[in-house]
Amino acid sequence: MSKVRLVVVGNGMVGHRFIEELIERADPGRYEITVFGAEPRPAYDRVHLSSYFSHHTSEDLSLVKPGFYDKHGIRLLLGEAVKKIDRSNREVHSNKGTVVEYDKLVLATGSYPWVPPIQGSQHHECFVYRTIEDLKAIRSAAKSGKSGVVIGGGLLGLEAAGALKALGLETHVVEFAPVLMAEQLEGDEEISAEDV
């Protein structure tokens, strides 16, 4: 019996967990696995991304044990974003020209930050807070900056604000809801700027 060609698009927390579970549950050697990851490093813990500013390294945040992909015969294509899925020919095409055929396809692309369509949002010093590369860029910009503004007063926005403050910037949070963490808190609970 030939191996099932499985392509996983996305090497974030969910994509990596899927692969771990598949390896644990599937018959050994059943799948020929290829994983596309748009970022330049293997899966890492985004939940604790803010700890990167407190002297943790990208290796500290890694979810991948050394040698994991080689041990399981997984082809990992880092820095390759999928640009096209050809369902008729069952092919995945990357931004680097790699074409991989599949029998089974898993899309584990995660989420993307919403950037409000406001003037200046495309400026080179306007950042999102999603990847280690984003945090590296924020840290670099903070070296010559005096203040920073975070748009969004939810949990991640407040984490970003804490990071800017820790980098020595005067920090401001802009939130569209009448209270901070509106999505996380219920009813009578409320956090104001004075509480932060």
What spans do the regions from the language model cover?
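Short, conserved glycine- and acidic-residue-centered signature motifs
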Residues: 128-131, 157, 186
